C-alpha cells in the first residue's frame, strides 16, 4: 500500500512537472481572436530580444546561392511586459494553415506554448490553422468518412533497397471488392514520404473532397524521392541521422529509373485499375521535375500529369554516375507524350516563385507545339500554401 501510494505520488509529481501547474504567468500561444488576429506569447523574463518569423507575415527577399533573391517569411519583434511575457498581435489573418518560429536572442525555437509542430527537412515549425473558408475547411479533420494512411515497405530491385511509401486508401477500401485508380504524389527536395501527408494535409484533403463528391475515391501513393534513402530520417537502418536537404542521387535519373518498381508493387499489393486512364502522377518542385521526366519516359503509363512549382529546365542533371538518358531529348519525349493524348497535363506556379520563368519557358514550348494543358497561376512563391491549393485543384479533375 505504501509503495503503491509512493508510486502514485511520484506519477502525480511528474504529471504536475510536465503541466507546470501554477508556475509563472498563465498565457496561451497562439491566441486566436474573434477577428482572426492572433496573439503570440512567450514567457522569457531573462531574454534580451524575442522575435517571431512565419508565413503569416509580409515576405522579405533574401539571397540564396544558386537561386538569386527568393521570398522568405518576414520577421517582427515581440514586446515584453512587466511579468516577463513577450507578445505580438498580428493583423487579422486570412484562413490558412500557417507555420512559424520564435527567435530568442538569435536562437530559433518552436513556440513552447503550442504543442502542434511539424518537421520540414531539418527544421521544426509551430503550426496554426485559421479556418473559415471552403478551401481551408478541406485541410481540417471533419465529420466525414475517413480513409486509412499506412506506412508500407516495398522492395526496389532497381535501387537495391527496401524502401518505404505512405499510402492512403479511401474510406470503405477494406470492406470493398472494387478496384480503384491510383494517384502518385511526389515531394520536393529534402522532403520524404511524410511530407505530403503532414505538411500537405493530403489525407484530410482527399477525405473531404471525396465526401463532398468532388473527387473520385482513389488510392494515393506518396513516395520518397531520395533514392539513396530507405525512408524518412530517423526511421531507417541508419538510425537518427541528421536530416539534410542535399542528398545524393536526387535529380540524376536514378529515382525516375526506379519508379516502375513502385507501380509494380502497388498493382501487385492493392486492388487497383491497371491502365493509363486510371493512373495519375504529380509533384511539387523536385517532385514536379520527377513527375515530368517519369511521365515523358513512360508515355503509356499516366493519363494525368501535374507539375506543382516544378523544377523544370533544359539542364541534363545526370552525370557519369547517373542516368543522363532520362533527361536526353526532353522536347521530343514531351511531343511523344502528347501524341498519346493524355487526359490532363496540369501546371501550377506562384507569381513570385523563383521557378516562374522556368515554367513559363516550358509553357512557351507547349504553346509552340499546340499541346493542350491546364494552367493555374497563384499569388506567392515556393511555399506549401500554394502546393496545398494545387492539390485541391488538381485532384477533382482526376479519373472523370
What is each residue range found by the language model?
Residues 1-11:
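Bacterial N-terminal signal peptides
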Residues 15-25:
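A general sequence property marking short-to-moderate contiguous segments
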Amino acid at each position: 500500500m505504501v509503495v503503491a501510494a509512493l508510486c502514485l505520488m511520484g506519477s502525480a509529481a511528474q504529471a504536475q512537472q510536465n503541466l507546470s501547474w501554477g508556475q509563472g504567468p498563465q498565457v496561451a500561444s497562439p491566441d486566436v481572436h474573434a477577428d482572426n488576429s492572433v496573439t503570440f506569447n512567450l514567457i522569457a523574463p531573462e531574454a534580451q530580444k524575442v522575435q517571431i518569423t512565419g508565413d503569416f507575415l509580409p515576405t522579405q527577399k533574401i539571397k540564396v546561392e544558386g537561386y538569386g533573391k527568393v521570398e522568405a517569411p518576414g520577421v517582427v519583434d515581440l514586446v515584453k511586459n512587466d511579468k516577463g511575457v513577450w507578445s505580438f498581435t498580428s493583423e487579422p489573418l486570412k484562413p490558412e494553415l500557417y507555420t512559424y518560429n520564435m527567435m530568442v536572442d538569435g536562437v530559433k525555437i518552436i513556440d513552447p506554448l503550442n504543442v502542434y509542430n511539424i518537421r520540414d527537412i531539418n527544421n521544426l515549425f509551430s503550426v496554426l490553422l485559421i479556418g473559415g473558408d471552403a478551401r481551408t475547411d478541406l485541410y481540417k479533420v471533419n465529420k466525414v468518412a475517413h480513409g486509412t494512411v499506412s506506412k508500407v515497405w516495398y522492395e526496389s530491385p532497381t535501387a537495391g533497397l527496401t524502401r518505404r511509401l505512405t499510402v492512403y486508401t479511401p474510406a470503405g477500401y477494406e470492406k470493398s471488392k472494387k478496384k480503384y485508380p491510383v494517384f502518385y504524389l511526389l515531394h520536393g527536395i529534402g522532403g520524404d514520404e511524410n511530407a505530403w501527408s503532414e505538411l500537405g494535409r493530403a489525407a484530410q484533403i482527399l477525405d473531404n473532397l471525396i465526401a463532398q463528391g468532388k473527387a473520385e475515391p482513389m488510392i494515393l501513393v506518396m513516395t520518397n524521392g531520395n533514392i539513396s534513402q530507405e525512408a524518412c530520417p530517423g526511421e531507417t537502418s541508419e538510425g537518427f541521422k541528421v536530416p539534410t536537404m542535399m542528398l545524393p542521387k536526387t535529380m540524376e535519373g536514378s529515382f525516375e529509373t526506379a519508379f516502375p518498381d513502385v507501380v509494380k508493387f502497388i498493382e501487385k499489393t492493392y486492388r487497383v485499375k491497371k491502365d493509363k486512364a486510371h493512373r495519375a502522377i504529380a509533384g511539387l518542385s523536385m517532385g514536379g521535375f520527377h513527375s515530368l521526366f517519369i511521365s515523358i519516359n513512360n508515355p503509356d503509363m499516366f493519363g494525368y500529369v501535374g507539375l506543382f512549382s516544378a523544377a523544370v529546365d533544359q539542364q541534363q542533371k545526370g552525370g557519369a554516375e547517373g542516368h543522363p538518358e532520362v533527361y536526353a531529348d526532353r522536347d521530343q519525349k514531351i511531343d511523344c507524350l502528347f501524341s498519346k493524348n493524355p487526359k490532363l497535363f496540369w501546371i501550377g506556379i506562384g507569381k513570385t516563385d523563383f521557378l516562374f520563368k522556368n515554367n513559363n519557358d516550358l509553357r512557351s514550348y507547349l504553346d509552340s507545339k499546340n499541346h493542350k494543358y491546364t494552367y493555374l497561376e497563384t499569388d506567392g512563391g515556393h511555399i506549401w500554401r500554394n502546393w496545398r491549393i494545387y492539390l485541391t485543384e488538381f485532384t477533382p479533375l482526376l479519373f472523370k
